[in-house]
């Protein structure tokens, strides 16, 4: 399922209150100021929707499924706050660009341009991107953050930011879980085989970072939330850097 905020499908992307089910953080802990200075919350028509990462003063990276097919005018982002409902700086969008090869769950990234510039400083910073062509190493630790649901099918989403650390899962293992064709080289997987820790509805588009706090991916999709033997699936920044660099 996708991981924006809503409940409809079981295998799709991860956003908030929409026609597809999207993940929140399951099995996580509260984030502290400064943990993710580049994270933004994305609301749609005033309600929780997705997450994203601030790349510079005018640009946010999120999942394509968070914005594809929806009116640009309905979106607002909030930066510089652990709360998705107050504090920080807000901006509407001036433009949306979805990856030109976005299809199904593949190439699931979009670039959002902001109507209001957001300077760095205080609790706000810009994401450091994984190198072009890089691929997260299986077994290494990664941390994902968001305001999504804390359980699969959960009807409420947290106001304050949560985070959870999970290991990178090899592409071979992830393909065994989902099927060879479902997991492309533009994706990577992370999760605990026993379940209990994952992104969930409402976390879509939000950041997953490596141990150096480098942005390696965006929350994309999965089979439910935190189920045993089903990893969370992420759009790969390293594999999709050319798109990001062209439009950021």
From Swiss-Prot:
This is Trypsin. The active site is at 65 (charge relay system), 108 (charge relay system), 204 (charge relay system). Residues 1-17 form the signal peptide. Belongs to the peptidase S1 family. One of its GO terms (molecular function) is serine-type endopeptidase activity. Residues 25-248 form the Peptidase S1 domain. The record marks 198 as: Required for specificity. Disulfide bonds join 50-66, 174-189, 200-225. One of its GO terms (biological process) is proteolysis. It comes from the Eukaryota. One of its GO terms (cellular component) is extracellular region.
